[in-house]
Amino acid sequence: EFRRVLFRSAKVQFVHQLVKWSGLDQLPKGSRILDVGCGIGGSSRILAKHYGFNVTGITISPGQVKRARELTSSALNCNFQVMDALDLKFEDGTFDAVWSVEAGAHMNDKVKFADEMLRTLRPGGYLALADWNSRDLRAYPPSFIEKLVLKQLLEQWVHPNFISIKEFGKIGRAH
């Protein structure tokens, strides 16, 4: 029970920090937020409850959507949908902000992932992104132990691949 409380507290603190860091705290209540890879909706609920945002969470997992709906009070402006992050069913510029935490590492096409998030973001909107990345492995080759860890993440945990922050930045700047 103690560890669960610590995890929840850390999750809430993390969301508040990412909101401040990304500028989402400048948005008015009622702003439309897309939570890409929402899981069971933890971040979505915090964004709706503490900031008054209207949050749409998407995940490819029907089980996660079901659980997110079970955990979310009808008083919160949150809705959850089963949807592929690489094929978002929203019009261009629908959202004031796009939020994505630890989803990109699961995407096999990082360019399409970025394209879809940026396409649904209104001009001048905010992108809040926190994810697993690797350093530039050509410039800074991994140690033997790091190679083993990467192998485990890619093969046993079935992550498609990791890219560096620099590589992801290039994708974003291409827009």
Regions found by a protein language model. Give the residues of each.
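Acceptor-substrate binding/catalytic loop of class I
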Residues: 150-167
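Class I SAM-dependent methyltransferase SAM/SAH-binding core
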Residues: 32-34, 40-87
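A short SAM/SAH-binding and catalytic strip from SAM-dependent methyltransferases
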Residues: 97-109
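Short, small-residue-biased leader/transition segments that mark boundaries at the very start
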Residues: 1-6
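A short acidic, Gly/Pro-enriched loop at the edge of an enzyme's catalytic core
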Residues: 86-98
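Conserved class I S-adenosyl-L-methionine
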Residues: 128-150
